[in-house]
Amino acid sequence: MSSVTRRSFLLGAGGAVVLTACGGSGSGGTGGTPPSLGITAIPDQNPELLNRLYPMVAARFAKATGLTVSYKPVTDYTAVVRAFEIGDIHLAWMGGLTGVQARSRVPGSTAIAQRDIDADFHSLFIANKSAGISPFTDVSGLSALAGHTLTFGSETSTSGRLMPQYFLMKGGLAQSALKGTPGFSGSHDATIEAVRTDSFEVGAVNEQVWTKTVAAAKVDLSSVQVLWRTPGYHDYHWLARPDLDTTFGAGTQQKVTDLLLGLDAAKAEDKAVLDLFGAKKFITTQNSNYDQIEAVAKAQGLLG
């Protein structure tokens, strides 16, 4: 694939953020110079927040590995998977579904770390109060959404589409029972805004983003309410390509993993990163934790 085609998957605004640290070495490259380690993340929230967080992460990865590390923003969830597949990206912050999709395209890829909240993650169904839907406590309550408009987040979002759609099916509500075709807002922030403005009566959203939005007083709880919190599931995680060590030097994957697992909220530098991730710490994970996500994705035709 040409470099022009490869770059088309990356967001050009501002270019990639490149961080370099001295003291390390890796294999690959010409003249003994290791190539740049590319990282990215699914664009699940406001780009301003992502552009604050991931350059910080790139800097920490550079310091831990001694490599040149570049954060490469992408335009959408599909672009993350594609960039990972073709090798533009070697480490990516994935959702459960995008991680499963990426592993299916790059066998041998490994989920190396997740946030403490990702082992028991939840989606929320929220609604504009003008819709007249009362909160409920069981999946069967989703039948109350019949005749109402609904938006998901990104088409390949785990918490904003895959699992909400799974629970709609489990609750016995066919999408044809909704008013019109479900929307796809593109991100959790956009879903909340769509419900706030009553562009859609109901939205499926990531609980962590909702909680943060409420804490920042960016949503009026007199007009938007939570209808239901789904059961938990595994979601976000860092995914490493199988050629990470052969490209950048033996031990690179372990150095990155150790850095993530060692982030300490009691240290100011680490807390700044953890706060933007909405977590208290990172914990270990493994590919099998996403077996449920894989099964649901296959059932919904989202894993080609």
Question: Whereabouts are the PLM-identified features?
Answer:
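A conserved helix-loop-strand patch within extracytoplasmic ligand-binding domains
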Residues: 115-171
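Ligand-binding cleft/hinge of the Venus flytrap
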Residues: 56-66, 158-184, 214-219
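A ligand-binding cleft/hinge motif common to bilobed small-molecule-binding domains
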Residues: 93-106, 167-170, 196, 201-222
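Bacterial lipoprotein signal-peptidase II cleavage site
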Residues: 23-30
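Short beta-strand->loop
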Residues: 109-118, 178-181, 214-232
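Short helix-initiation/N-cap motifs at beta->coil->alpha
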Residues: 72-82, 97, 178-193
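An extracytoplasmic/periplasmic, membrane-proximal ligand-sensing/linker region
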Residues: 34-41, 45-56, 233, 239-240, ...
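N-terminal secretory signal peptides and thylakoid transit peptides that target proteins
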Residues: 1-17, 23
